[in-house]
């Protein structure tokens, strides 16, 4: 049994690696930091390969696939990604395009390549509760990337189901999680964050049960349910105010 995890050096990805290792899975771990990956390797007893790749460079996505295509990989976890906070005029276009490359294009490349290979049993795409809403002022591009991940995963699930492919497709949509994401996005959440350990275990357990949409935490589930009934303009105003508070509490 073997799993490939991108963005594995910290946060949810790191905890997923540890949890799957405890379940007996050999691992292929990918992240930019070789030091963090090698440190994680020491904490896990199963066989591990590490690849220090910046996957926002899309050539590295293809290179990664070539490196591991002879392995029998059962689980693909597309976890690599990040967010940017700021008014549309403040965030640099190159930074936004880099985020799109990692959050969307990398995920799609790896998903497509491993599906074509025909060995994969589970794909877990890490999105966000942001991906289930109607837009995120002050994090507009990030919200849009996660909406893409959600909708791509939903459509892929149905296509594979109709073809009777025995492949589990799941999309993880957490609310606030206590990870380095907050520092990179330069925000601080007002809501209580879940631990990455809890989110990782919850997500993988639900993935094995072939749950399509995985939302950890009761409060987030309830919130997402009621948001569906709000008019779009009202929801955008509420979201803007919530985002602004993240900036004011840093």
Residue ranges of each PLM-predicted region?
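Substrate-binding pocket helix/loop in short-chain dehydrogenase/reductase
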Residues: 87-88, 95-100
